[in-house]
Regions:
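Non-catalytic C-terminal accessory region of glycerolipid acyltransferases
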Residues: 37-170
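Catalytic core of membrane glycerolipid acyltransferases/transacylases, capturing the structured
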Residues: 1-33
Length: 170
């Protein structure tokens, strides 16, 4: 499995930096020429020719210990539609533990839920597929959130939205 990561992460020092540079990481960049040529060719080779898995965290979906699914951006779905490959939808459940991790946080247990895969529809355009896949992925994550936490998803902030947080907003 390959992982897409921001190109600036490759400058990290130590063991994590070593992993970033040598553990099947694919850099993503703001450089338009790189993205249109090298990145595109790399994904095409890995997804279409070699049938590899590629992990792409959709933009702005990763917030530290934030339980709620974030409304997605189109990037990962664009490439899935472009290369006619499925999205393996996932939701990470976060359970607060009793032990402290830091002064501000309790330890958190992470449970990965693999949801139904989402396939492009061969009758639709790449554009329509990317938007439909994005919508379906969000719907699945919303449903998982509501089933796991036993409450409807809304975006009014409460302390419990941040897993393990011992603080208060008051």
């Amino acid at each position: 499995m390959f992982i897409v990561s921001q190109d600036t992460n490759f400058a990290m020092k130590g063991f994590l930096g070593f992993l970033m540079r040598y553990a099947d990481e694919i850099p993503v960049s703001k450089d338009k020429d790189y993205m249109e040529r090298h990145f595109y060719r790399t994904l095409n080779n890995l997804l279409v020719n070699k049938k590899e898995y590629i992990l792409i965290y959709p933009e702005q979906e990763m917030w530290f210990n934030y339980r709620k699914p974030r409304p997605p951006k189109r990037g990962a779905y664009f490439y899935a539609a472009k290369f006619n490959v499925p999205i393996i939808s996932c939701f990470v459940e976060m359970r607060d533990m009793d032990k402290d991790d830091t002064e501000e946080f309790k330890r958190v247990k992470y449970v990965l839920h693999i949801l139904d895969p989402i396939y492009p529809d061969p009758e639709k355009s790449e554009r329509d597929n990317s938007f439909d896949m994005m919508k379906k992925d969000y719907e699945q994550k919303k449903e998982a959130y509501e089933q796991i936490y036993k409450r409807p998803l809304d975006y009014a902030f409460s302390d419990s939205d941040i897993a393990g947080w011992k603080g208060t907003t008051e």
